[in-house]
Amino acid sequence: MVEISWNAMAVLLSILFNWGLQNPDAILYGDNVSSLWCMSVNVYHEARGETRTEQIAVSQVVLNRVADPRWPDTPCKVITQNQQFSWYWDTRSDQIHDLRTFRENIYAALLVYTDRTDDVVKGATHYYAHDIIDPPPWGKNMTVANKLGGHT
């Protein structure tokens, strides 16, 4: 599971309040904080340094999977599912070192999680970095919904 430290929670909460959300307490109930946290960490590792649209796309794929009965029913379960997101399963550190970038990643995840953006991936449940592998074996028979920067 993607763990939330107290420092990280403080960063997340300050961002929610500083962005002036009309109802930030609605996000702080139940599994919402964990879901938003998992999505933000996923964006950090999957699309750090990419455009806001590409970061939104990564978050949208996660929520599209949550909405699809073939996948787990929460963002954290989708992200940590066996071999789905490479950063979670590789042997490298998952530490977040760039808090400025991470704040932007949280914002991208928040836009998707609170349904404040269009589905830029048009319902897609998969993507891959086409500069690394084009296409991966599991994607050979799939229809391309969109290409955004380094992701298809």
Feature locations, PLM:
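Catalytic phosphate/metal-binding cores of nucleic-acid and nucleotide-processing enzymes, i.e., regions
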Residues: 2-8, 24-26
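Bacterial extracytoplasmic/cell-wall-associated proteins, especially those involved in peptidoglycan
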Residues: 17-152
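Hydrophobic membrane-insertion alpha-helices, especially the h-region
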Residues: 7-18
